[in-house]
C-alpha cells in the first residue's frame, strides 16, 4: 500500500505571500518539499485522490500523479473542495461534449453538505457534465484496498476520517476538524496515523500559547497525541 501526501499546508499554503514568519521564509529559500499546498492524499494502489484544494492540479503535477480513477471529499470546507474542477479535464471531453465519469465515494452527509454550500456542485458534475459518478458510502473495497469512511462529527459538522488497509497494513487519515477525536474500533492496530491541526509544542508563530488562542479547542499538541 502506497500513500502520497499531495498537500499538507492547511487552509493557507506555505509560504504564505503575506507572511514573514521563519517557516514561510525558509520555504521561500529552500522551496521543494518545504512549500506546502492544500490538504490532500493520494492512494497510489487504486488511483484515488482524497480532497481537492484550490491548488490540487499543482500538487498532482509536483507529485507525479497522472491518473485519478477514484475521488473522495472529506468535508465541505473550501480548502478541501475549491479545486473540484480538476474532474473536468479528467472526466469530460469538451470537444466531443461527452463525459466519462470518475467514481466519487463520499459519505452521504458530506454530499449533502457540499451541495448545500456549493450550489449543487457535485450534482452538476454528475448530472450535467457526467464527469463523476457519486456513490454515497461509508465503506468501499477496490482491489485489495479496503476503505472505511468514518464520520467524526463534531461541533463543526460532518468530517470524514479514512481508515485505509490492504490486509497487512492500516493507515488512518484524519486531515481536519480532528478535535474532539471520537473513538472508533476501526482505528485500533493502525500502523500509521496521518493527522492535521497539530501544534508541535503548543506555541504559535507569534510566540503566544495555544491554550490562550480562540481556536485552542480545535488543535492538538504532540503531547496530547
How would you describe each model-predicted region?
Residues 77-81, 112-113, 156-157, 179-182, ...:
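Active-site environment of divalent metal-dependent phosphoester hydrolases
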Residues 87-104, 108, 206-225:
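P-loop/Walker A phosphate-binding loop and immediately adjacent motor/lid segment at beta-alpha junctions
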Residues 96-101, 108-132:
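Active-site neighborhood of divalent metal-dependent phosphoester bond hydrolases
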Residues 179-225:
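Cap/insert and terminal regions of metallo-dependent hydrolase folds
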Residues 18-20, 63-65, 85-89, 118-120, ...:
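Short, glycine/charged-enriched secondary-structure capping and boundary segments
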Residues 75-80, 148, 154-155, 195, ...:
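Histidine-centered active-site/metal-ligand motif
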Residues 1-63, 131-188:
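Core dinuclear metal-dependent hydrolase active-site scaffold
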Residues 46-104, 191-192:
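Active-site metal-binding motif and surrounding structural segment of the metallo-beta-lactamase
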